[in-house]
């Protein structure tokens, strides 16, 4: 079983990936948050920092492209090849409304014929290995057989399948029977992604390669423990937090660091039995002094929870 860290926009940047890789084991590949190329084929400064080989040295990292224009996709793969990458991942699964409204991400599943034309072109001309990250439909699971037939036609490097439709977003239960069908029929590796929040859930699927996202964001030792290593401890969680905090403070302005660390702690605090007043103090912290004091209280007044898992908002 290989385990991949899913790209989480606004969280798993190069600094986060490096610190996680240095602190915990068990992750075989880190997928970068998507690049959505424009006709200028230029990168933002943040994207340049994220994909720079020196920022990803010593760990297996895969760039991801969000794009509906085959020509732009192919030009971007050339730039990534020249930067030293051997693989690129095509995002056909992002369910964000702002993405799908432009016909990108999961929005590309809406028109199977156009999707097939796009895949025809990129797989006939790509200069890198191309893996896919997809869902199992757009409006309905009735679309699955047609999409399955399409994906099986191409020399896919790996197929990462989140077996929900776009409309299902992250609700309900994943259609694992669709994943099992794909894994049985595909001549290439099929990787399972979806609701893997506990060690027991990972081990239940350990016949397959897995992609973990929100579960790893809550429990950064999840992949390590699922592979037979040490589980999360308060000391290892504190070490991860402090390394991450120090690295951001080296490179980012204070307000940006506090905003990012609030995003990090949104997940990490779910691994802790933390008193409500301490959570409130953390949420209110707006500068490094207040944040540092609140985090000190988090790690002195909390314990690792018995059942570590991601809890979706509103549940």
Where do the language-model regions lie?
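Flavin-dependent oxidoreductase catalytic cores
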Residues: 1-315
């Amino acid at each position: 079983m290989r385990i991949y860290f899913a790209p989480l926009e606004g969280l798993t940047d190069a600094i986060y990936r490096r610190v996680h890789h240095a602190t915990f084991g068990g992750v075989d590949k880190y997928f970068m948050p998507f690049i959505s190329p424009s006709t200028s084929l230029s990168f933002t400064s943040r994207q340049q920092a994220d994909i720079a080989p020196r920022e990803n040295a010593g760990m297996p990292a895969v760039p991801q492209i969000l794009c509906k224009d085959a020509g732009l996709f192919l030009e971007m793969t050339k730039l990534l090849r020249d930067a030293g990458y051997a693989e690129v991942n095509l995002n056909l699964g992002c369910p964000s409304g702002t993405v799908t409204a432009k016909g990108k991400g999961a929005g590309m599943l809406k028109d199977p014929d156009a999707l097939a034309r796009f895949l025809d072109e990129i797989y006939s001309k790509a200069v890198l290995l191309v893996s896919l990250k997809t869902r199992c439909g757009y409006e309905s699971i009735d679309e699955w057989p047609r999409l399955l037939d399409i994906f099986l036609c191409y020399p896919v490097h790996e197929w990462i399948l989140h077996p929900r439709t776009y409309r299902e977003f992250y609700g309900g239960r994943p259609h694992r029977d669709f994943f099992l069908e794909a894994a049985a029929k595909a001549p290439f590796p099929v990787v399972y992604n979806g609701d893997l929040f506990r060690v027991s859930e990972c081990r239940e699927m350990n016949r397959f390669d897995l992609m973990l996202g929100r579960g790893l964001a809550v429990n950064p030792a999840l992949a390590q423990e699922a592979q037979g290593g040490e589980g999360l401890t308060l000391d290892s969680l504190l070490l991860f937090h402090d390394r991450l905090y120090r690295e951001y403070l080296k490179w980012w302005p204070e307000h940006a660091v506090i905003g990012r660390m609030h995003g990090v702690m949104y997940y990490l605090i779910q691994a802790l039995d933390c008193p409500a007043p301490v959570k409130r103090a953390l949420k209110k912290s707006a500068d490094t002094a207040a944040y540092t004091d609140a985090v000190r209280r988090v790690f002195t007044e909390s314990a690792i929870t018995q059942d570590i898992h991601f809890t979706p908002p509103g549940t």
